[in-house]
Design a protein with these regions (language model features):
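Nudix hydrolase/Nudix homology domain
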Residues: 1-18, 24, 77, 150-193
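N-terminal strand-loop-strand
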Residues: 41-79, 107, 111
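Acidic, metal-coordinating catalytic segment for phosphate/diphosphate chemistry
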Residues: 12-15, 19-58
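Unchanged
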Residues: 85-109, 117-175, 191-192
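Short alpha-helical scaffold segments that flank and stabilize functional sites
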Residues: 5-8, 28, 62, 97, ...
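Short, highly charged low-complexity linear segments
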Residues: 54-66, 128, 170-180
Length: 193
């Protein structure tokens, strides 16, 4: 409520009230978690406006029985190429851009593997106060070549039985398995929760 109120505050009084409400919410959350009030306040402040789920797009690119993964600079673990969808992009535009930026490959989207509720994946690394949906696309390479970026210092293809340590809030083994199933059986329906 405080986030929406701050976004639409009509005057200084409203801003003060909603700021105080956000402070109280941070105090309550910090008492029920391992986070300090300052950490909670910072997290709240990073997401102004109406609270809606964020959209994470990921690409499953399978070549010669191996799946493309990128190493994340932020945690040193591996994930499917992708990231937050930008405002104004269609989902397919977002994933094509993300794959090019993170791996160097140009791709075409073949179909949607799944739509996942990212917060329902059990792990301790996910954003504690925000909700996200993950859209997983099966893509094929049209061109380009593997190259690293400032976000992804390494790019590689991995067999399902030889996966490196995964960045779990970005990519988990279950969605990789769904991608392999979709690649083997094109008539398999989209996975959704």
């Amino acid at each position: 409520m405080s986030q929406v109120g701050l976004e639409h505050a009509a005057n200084g009084y409203d801003t003060e009230r909603y700021t105080r409400l956000r402070e109280l919410a941070a105090e309550i959350v910090s008492k029920q978690s391992t986070l300090s009030e300052e950490e909670v306040q910072k997290s709240f402040a990073m997401q102004p406006g109406y609270i809606t789920p964020k959209v994470d797009v990921r690409a499953a690119i399978i070549h010669d029985g191996k799946i493309l993964l990128v190493k994340e600079e932020s945690d040193g673990r591996w994930s499917l190429p992708g990231g937050w969808a930008d405002v104004g992009d269609t989902p397919s535009q977002a994933i094509i851009r993300e794959v090019r930026e993170e791996s160097g490959f140009d791709v075409r989207v073949r179909n949607v593997v799944g739509v996942y509720d990212a917060n329902r994946v059990p792990n301790e690394e996910w954003m504690p106060f925000y909700h996200a949906y993950k859209l997983l696309f099966l893509c094929e390479i049209l061109g380009g070549e593997a190259r690293s970026s400032h976000e992804t210092p390494d790019v590689g293809f991995f067999a399902l039985d030889q996966l490196p340590p995964l960045s779990l809030f970005r990519t988990n083994r279950g969605i990789i398995e769904d991608a392999f199933e979709q690649a083997k059986n094109a008539s398999k329906g989209t996975v959704f929760e």
